Amino acid sequence: MARRAGVSQSTVSLVFSGKGVGRISARTEAAVRAAAAELGYRPNAAARALKTGAARTVALVVPDIMNPFFGGLLRGAQTAARAAGYAVALIDTDNDRDWGAASAEALRAGPADGLLLFEVDPPPRAAGSEPIVVIESESRGHPSVRLDAERGTEAAVRHLLELGHERIGHVASVYDRPTFRLRRRAVDRLVAGDVARVHSDFTLASALAAARELLSAHADLTALFCDDDIVAAGAYLAARELGLGIPGDLSIVGFDGLDIGRVLDPPVTTVAADAEELGRVAFELLMAQLAGRRPRSRVLPVELEVRGSTAAPR
């Protein structure tokens, strides 16, 4: 392989041990990997782990793989990991906090070199020096990365207020997580009076039922803020069941910027978040820890994308 790539055996070793970062050029690494592919070589991960004590694998723990947001998150983390010679193992907790905590504890003592925990608390016994990054949450002992959900929600609600809406309802997440508390706080701060609110999980059936309940009980609502674009899609279904046009009778704003929002009719105004960037940054923070550094936590910006689902009330 070294002969095929035109490099030394030690250079090949650096590439496949993951120790070549900063020591060999990207062109040289690409040549080595191309030679390996031509020769059909695949490194033995198990043998390497026994020899080095490192599995070159990180675990990403998420609450719901059925939500497309987490596909983007995985893609971002995986792309960054692959460039660094790591694999990403995905764990789905199915929104079970206890299972998430148990998974994190097991992975901490198991095959993963580091943990990326989405809305999962780090194991209580985990030292601050252990390679753990929390996503969309906060931990005193570990670096975190999250979206600026509060500012994004403020932008969405202000957009509705500027259009002239005064009666704004909130189809909120049923899950009591930091990001959803920030969204709820922003809505409560900006909307006058008591906010008409219902709760939904991130399925169309749940969102349809919740939005139907909200709109039936509060016929004076002219706009809805939804904690997710899937929830917004359920609100579309409820509005049409009740004979409400969008945006003529009801304006709707979602969150996350998922593809489903673009195919709704009309496309939903949404607070767009870059899930891939969130995953990439999370992995970079983890790599910094693995290199012995103490990276700072990050807050990533979001952006309101105004589409066809919002207009001035009649």
List where the protein language model places each region.
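N-terminal helix-turn-helix DNA-binding module of bacterial transcription factors
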Residues: 1-55, 314
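Hinge/beta->alpha junction and helix N-cap segments in small-molecule ligand-binding domains
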Residues: 45, 63-72, 91-99, 145-155, ...
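Short beta-strand segments enriched in small/hydrophobic residues
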Residues: 11-14, 50-64, 159, 167-173
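Periplasmic-binding protein-like
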Residues: 104, 111-119, 167-172, 197-198, ...
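Alpha-helical recognition/docking segments in bacterial nutrient-uptake
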Residues: 57-158, 162, 214-216, 220
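Short gly/ser/thr-rich secondary-structure transition/capping motifs
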Residues: 39-44, 98, 116-117, 236
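Flexible loop/turn connectors
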Residues: 217-314
